[in-house]
């Protein structure tokens, strides 16, 4: 449980500090649960510019260079009927990148093998309950 946006961001920084490239972070949660704050932390852990990370709801996908390139997708505006496939997310993150996907429940499929699922929930006031699960398996399994 985090009690401030800065703590949620710090969780992201600690997670990504050990990334080596090819990781995918899928973020789930209602509006205002801290998904973008978590991605800012990922950027900080990757030595990218966290202040440049905003919710890319209108752009859908942005990239931030750092130790590894952070590709940040926000699927909020997508309907979830396969229109995510047109973004080319399956080609990302590549060996020198990390892909973070907000509103990951709108993905039509999860083709990646090294995935961190981050679930954020309101826990009253500024508190957030954050669950992180890592799974590494063959794509499409």
What are these regions (language model features)?
Residues 1-14:
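N-terminal pre-Walker A segment at the start of P-loop NTPase domains
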Residues 16-22:
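Phosphate-binding P-loop
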Residues 25-27:
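Hydrophobic anchor at the beta1->P-loop junction of P-loop NTPases
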Residues 31:
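The conserved Walker
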Residues 35:
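Conserved lysine of the Walker
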Residues 48-64:
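Short beta-strand-centered segment that lines the nucleotide-binding/catalytic pocket of NTP-utilizing
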Residues 80-141:
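Short phosphate-coordinating micro-motif centered on Lys-Gly-acidic
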């Amino acid at each position: 449980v985090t009690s401030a946006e800065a703590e949620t961001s710090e969780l992201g920084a600690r997670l990504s500090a050990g990334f080596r490239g090819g990781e995918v972070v899928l973020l789930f949660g209602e509006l205002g649960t801290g998904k973008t704050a978590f991605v800012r932390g990922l950027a900080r852990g990757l030595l990218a510019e966290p202040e440049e990370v905003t919710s890319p709801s209108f752009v859908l996908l942005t990239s931030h260079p750092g130790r590894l390139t952070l590709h940040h997708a926000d699927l909020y505006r997508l309907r979830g009927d396969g229109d995510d496939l047109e973004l080319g997310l399956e080609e990302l993150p590549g060996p020198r990148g990390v892909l973070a996907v907000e509103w990951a429940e709108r993905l039509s499929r999860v083709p990646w093998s090294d995935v961190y699922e981050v679930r954020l929930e309101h826990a009253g006031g500024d508190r957030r309950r954050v669950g992180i699960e890592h799974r590494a398996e063959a794509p499409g399994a």
